[in-house]
């Protein structure tokens, strides 16, 4: 029996080490690829070759590595009071930046959330799902939890008199709270996981956390990928609490073991609730449950092995035990029971919530919902993301059985048409698109904003290259820390016979996420639910270096490392200066197209017909120069149409800025107008885009493209109205339009370029001198 137990444990350990080795290989390849995988930096990609792109991204990664070291040298010498002040000021700056993006820039997530907001608002106000959102919620019933959350927020907004036009602020405020709570929980998790963390180390981690640009850009990402973050991190924090052994501080403080056990079961129930709700909100939460179960089984098996040997082992396992085998046995039973309670509660809460939300939404999705195999089938089309053709194919079948049969047949056809090399290329593309970029798709999903002045151009517009580099450098910094942690975990597991089961749980979640998106629909945004886990693993991988140095007192090695850090900073400063000189003409004197959006609304789901005697008017706010207007329409009569429309862009007072005619004759069903005119400096007050029929048969009407979703108007700075014979009817919709300034000029001015390069050079230089000065203080025993 003893030999069977040993063999079983060896098999489990071998499988775990093998999985971590595969995860290391995947992340290492992503790390290498990441140095040239940031194509959203369009200006840099327009002239830079692969080596230059790799060097620029390498500078970004090196910046965060040096910053991590420099902050450690500074904060380790600070008093507690200073550290607290730094934390408070940093938190205030973070909140200020979040408020700027939340309340001023006001970008918005373009896709699914609109249907959910409209459906939730109609449920609250009419008791049924709006027609505009019905298809989406009938096809994707997995969004019902998202609908419930949104409905609660709509009710809260109605209570405080918040109208449909500004509801997005309420939703995004809630989204920001979710982001900040997840950051707080991640920091608390690290403190509980790495118990020897000192105050200055926690402060350093917090400051590096604040360098993550998603904390600011993501405030408007009202979607399940962000709303699920606090649920996931709360679950993982409670899981770590459950796995802690009884005793310790509680016994020292006179607390009874029974009270600790009851609290443990309470945590298990709460963790199960978070996992169940998280699963209903986003199905990838099942990966957390599977990882917790797998790691828990291994942990309990290793603990049982140790107890069976009566404590007389030659191997060391990092399990909760003391010198009393009976107590160890009791501890193992407690943890097994609490893990079982956790999983049972997750199932109960998930099933209960699922039933409640189905009853609330009130849509029979038996035949309309897509089968799970649909996403497997759809992801077999390069590049492995969502595509409308496969969605239309699945939706065209009436019943559940027909959908499953048709999807299975189409999946088989796709697989038979693919060679092994094609499939491997698809897998590589899906993994790269999901876990290979640090932007999380924000240039696609969040680029549309209400305000396009201020920092918009540098973050979302044609000058976003530096911010893209910042994203990619920070993400590769995270991957570097994770790779270091995997190496340390593997070394401890194989050589020292020590297993960090909690770290293994986090790694197993990432491993499961990679496998999941090999099979499922892939997208850059789908790595967001795992962002905080990656942060925790990164800092866990970086922390042991500092702790080992100080605990061992290896000051000679410290001095050498500080010197290396300083010289790396000096080298980076030199590269920045040389690159700045070499690319001066390219950046400051080479003309290129520099489009700048002034007011934009690109969501569309229907069209609004404009009959004889009617005028469709969209009011907009323009605060920057503009010279281009774009609108779209539908022409049901197509080539035979006789309709002629007048299109005007005018001030609210009536002064016409631009006017043209739209002739529908000889055109197809889908039409668009791109109109250029002399650059106009905006006047005070609002502007209007007006469409009016001036001739043609009564039956030949154009229908202008709009976004009409009950309770959700994506363009909140104006209203859409339909006027006829002096009467104006306000529509709960937004016209699809774009007003922009198209200009040809250099990327930036010489003055701005010199200032930017000089600042970057001085920052690297300062960090290098700081590290060098700290070497002197270490050698002189002044720390």
Protein language model regions, located:
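Short hydrophobic/aromatic helix or loop-helix immediately within or flanking a transmembrane segment
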Residues: 119, 135-165, 173-176
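Multi-pass, polyprenyl lipid-linked donor-dependent membrane glycosyltransferases
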Residues: 171-178, 204-239, 278-288, 526-531
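Membrane-proximal stem/loop segments at transmembrane-domain junctions that anchor or position
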Residues: 129, 358-450
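Membrane-interface alpha helices of multi-pass inner-membrane proteins
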Residues: 206, 267-282, 293, 514
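Extracytosolic helix-loop segments that constitute the early lumenal/periplasmic catalytic or substrate-binding loops
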Residues: 114-139, 145, 384-389
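Transmembrane-helix motifs of polytopic, lipid-linked glycan transferases
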Residues: 170-195, 234, 481-490
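Start-transfer (signal-anchor) and selected internal transmembrane alpha helices
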Residues: 1-99, 326, 331-345, 563-569, ...
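Membrane-interface anchor segments at the N-terminal boundary of transmembrane helices
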Residues: 43-58, 170, 429-510, 562, ...
């Amino acid at each position: 029996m003893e030999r069977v137990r040993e063999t079983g444990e060896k098999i489990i350990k071998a499988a775990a080490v093998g999985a971590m080795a595969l995860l290391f290989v995947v992340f290492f390849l992503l790390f290498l690829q990441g140095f040239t995988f940031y194509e959203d930096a369009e200006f840099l990609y327009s002239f830079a070759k692969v080596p230059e792109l790799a060097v620029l991204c390498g500078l970004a990664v090196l910046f965060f590595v040096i910053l991590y070291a420099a902050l450690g040298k500074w904060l380790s010498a600070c008093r507690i009071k200073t550290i607290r002040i730094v934390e408070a000021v940093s938190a205030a700056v973070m909140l200020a930046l979040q408020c700027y993006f939340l309340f001023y820039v006001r970008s918005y997530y373009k896709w699914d959330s609109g249907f959910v907001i409209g459906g939730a608002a109609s449920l609250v106000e009419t008791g049924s799902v709006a027609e505009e959102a019905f298809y989406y919620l009938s096809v994707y019933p997995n969004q019902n939890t998202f609908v419930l959350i949104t409905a609660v927020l709509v009710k809260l907004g109605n209570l405080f008199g918040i109208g449909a036009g500004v509801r997005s602020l309420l939703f995004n405020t809630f989204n920001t709270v979710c982001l900040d709570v997840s950051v707080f929980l991640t920091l608390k998790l690290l403190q509980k996981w790495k118990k020897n963390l000192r105050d200055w180390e926690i402060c350093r981690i917090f400051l590096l956390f604040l360098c993550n640009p998603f904390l600011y850009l993501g405030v408007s990402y009202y979607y399940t990928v962000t709303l699920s973050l606090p649920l996931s991190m709360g679950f993982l924090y409670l899981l770590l609490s459950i796995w802690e052994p009884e005793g310790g501080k509680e016994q020292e403080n006179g607390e009874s073991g029974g009270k600790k056990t009851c609290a443990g079961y309470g945590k298990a129930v709460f963790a199960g609730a978070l996992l169940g709700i998280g699963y209903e909100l986003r199905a990838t939460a099942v990966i957390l449950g599977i990882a917790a179960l797998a790691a828990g089984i291994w942990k309990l098996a290793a603990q049982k092995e140790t107890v069976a040997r009566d404590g007389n082992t030659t191997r060391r396992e990092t399990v909760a035990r003391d010198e009393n085998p009976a107590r160890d046995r009791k501890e193992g039973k407690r943890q097994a029971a609490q893990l079982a309670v956790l999983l049972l509660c997750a199932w109960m809460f998930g099933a209960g919530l699922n039933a409640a939300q189905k009853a609330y939404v009130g849509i029979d999705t038996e035949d309309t919902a897509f089968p799970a195999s649909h996403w497997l089938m759809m992801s077999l089309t390069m590049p492995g993301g969502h595509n409308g053709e496969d969605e239309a194919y699945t939706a065209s079948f009436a019943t559940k059985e027909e959908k499953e049969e048709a999807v299975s047949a189409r999946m088989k056809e796709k697989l038979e048409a693919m060679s092994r090399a094609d499939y491997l290329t698809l897998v590589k593309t899906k993994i790269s698109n999901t876990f290979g970029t640090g932007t999380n798709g924000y240039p696609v999903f969040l680029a549309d904003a209400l305000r396009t002045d201020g920092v918009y151009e540098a973050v979302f517009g044609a000058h976003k290259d530096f911010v893209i580099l910042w994203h990619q450098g920070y993400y590769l910094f995270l991957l570097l820390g994770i790779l270091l942690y995997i190496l340390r975990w593997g070394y401890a597991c194989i050589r020292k016979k020590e297993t960090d089961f909690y770290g293994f749980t986090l790694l197993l979640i990432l491993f499961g996420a990679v496998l999941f998106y090999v099979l499922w629909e892939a997208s850059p945004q789908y790595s967001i639910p795992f962002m905080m886990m990656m942060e925790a693993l990164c800092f866990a991988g970086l922390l042991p270096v500092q702790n080992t140095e100080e605990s061992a007192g290896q000051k000679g090695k410290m001095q050498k490392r500080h010197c290396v850090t300083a010289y790396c900073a000096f080298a980076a400063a030199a590269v920045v200066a040389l690159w700045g000189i070499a690319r001066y003409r390219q950046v400051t004197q080479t003309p290129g197209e520099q489009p700048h959006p002034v007011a934009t609304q690109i969501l569309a789901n229907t069209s609004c017909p404009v009959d004889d005697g009617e005028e469709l008017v969209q009011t907009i706010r323009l605060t920057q120069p503009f010279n281009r207007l774009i609108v779209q329409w539908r022409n049901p009569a197509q080539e035979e149409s006789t309709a002629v429309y007048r299109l005007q862009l005018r001030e609210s007072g009536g002064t016409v800025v631009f006017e043209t005619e739209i002739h529908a004759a000889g055109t197809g069903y889908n039409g668009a107008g791109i109109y250029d005119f002399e650059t106009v400096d905006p006047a005070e007050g609002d502007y209007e885009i007006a469409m009016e029929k001036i001739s043609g048969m009564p039956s030949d009407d154009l229908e202008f493209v709009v976004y009409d979703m009950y309770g959700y108007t994506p363009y909140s700075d104006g209203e859409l109205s339909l006027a006829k014979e002096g009467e104006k009817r306000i529509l709960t919709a937004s016209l699809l339009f774009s007003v922009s300034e198209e200009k040809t000029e250099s990327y930036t001015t010489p003055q701005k370029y010199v200032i930017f390069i000089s600042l970057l050079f001085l920052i690297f230089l300062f960090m290098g001198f700081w590290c060098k000065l700290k070497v002197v203080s270490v050698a002189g025993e002044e720390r």
